[in-house]
């Protein structure tokens, strides 16, 4: 169930991000922000992104994409408790890594989810969010430090998984605390014929984009159990960080390409990270 719901959530994220990039926005209209055409299963589809809300009768039947995210998170947490927390003494604790009781290991795991979310949410709500470069440097540095710290507390496999748990929790938090509430406030304003606060749409879109960039790394971590030579590597935290850079830059490259912006310099960052990754894996063997 967790994998199925995750597929649906990721599919939604990719679809709407793709549509936003592909819509023709050079339209002179007071109501239409962008439009485009698609073809699927033998039919043409017209897509229109509106500047203002649709008629009230349409608002009452809006399709809001939220349950994919909610169910992915709920099923993931259930699996976390049933498989890992219940068997924490075996799956989470390694006395060679750190002398810690299973109870403390579980508490640290739970606290890490809340702590990372609070820090990330604070950064998003601060003026720092206006400086993309600085925001990226700080969040990636935080990810690197978190990955390193977790490998010094938990078993290698659970440390890897914990990074995915943290990112997945952030993605859910974005949907549950920002995206959906903002959308509901926009709908309420529309139903009352009040002016829509554009900052609500911008904040929701911003968090949605963050989720989009996190997706590849979370999916990689979900599958990392199949790559023991990476998970149990001496420098697994650095390997994970290299993958984070490669996957994020790849996502950014294709997002720009969807808007017909070709920036090959982004690929240079990916290539450097890939060379660094290969060096770690093949020179410093487990």
Question: What is each residue range found by the language model?
Answer:
Residues 1-286:
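Polytopic transmembrane helical bundles with strong interfacial aromatic enrichment
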